[in-house]
Amino acid sequence: LETLENAKFRYHVSNGEGCNKDRHKAKHLIVEDFDNIAAEIEAKLQDRLLFVIFASGGGTGSGAGPMLIDLLLDDGREVGAVTILPSPAESVKAHINSYECFTELTQIQGTAACFILDNNRGDKINLNEQFADDFNSFLEIPEKYKSLRGNIDRAEIEETLKAHGMAMIVHAQGVDSSQVIQALTDNEYAPAEADRTVKYITAALTGNVSMEDLEKAVGTPVDTFRAYSGEESICCVCGMTYPKTRLEEMYNKVAENKDTIRKNLEATQETAMQKDINFLNELQPKHREVPSGSGSREERRHLSKRDILNKYL
């Protein structure tokens, strides 16, 4: 929390000192403290639409994120997600966490847009900054771009962000369709599926950019919302299917390394030490056996401890 110098509100989850990539630990923390978390959100965030932001490969966000979204939806909130996929260079544990996280996230009904950043697309700090800039630019469209030819209002921005499924926002410099289409392919997000599923295309486009060209590139939406900009284009495509191909790559990485990791973990639990070095023990007089079940309760308790110690005698 100390790194969030400019955060308007901060809340420290009770007993939350990090989860060491343990998703189950994060879930228990949220369950135990949810009443306080919900009260904080209710008191400080009156917005109609909330986004829960988390890395899917860690422990805290990966475990708590989907659960928190589900709980907030149950409270009547409109909730979306901004989450991050681990790069192929990250650990197998990060990929396991991410895949389990998306298994839960994709089963939640009624979520708003899900923005899925991909650490395989570049430096993670740069990717985060790029997304924040693009998201803010999209929110500013109604105030920044007004034209007799067409406008986008706040309700259309909200309708776009409430669309269930994967979404992406791109910001392209240039005055023709090809540059916007290139931005929709080369960006900070997980690669889109090839099924061309899309609900809305909402964009402030320069005069030479054709909405029809964008539809040919990404798919036919239910509706489009367009404003007219100057020398830049800001485009949101939403209601897409989750990035199954990219998620399958993570699954395969785990599967390929499963046997090796299991063997390594089992090896640390085995010992090659010989147990017959102290031949002098064979010359010691035998201890008197104490019949099982005899004696007082205290004696039986000592017998139990003796059984444990006998493994080392």
Kindly give the residue locations of the regions a language model identified.
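Tubulin/FtsZ superfamily GTPase core signature
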Residues: 1-313
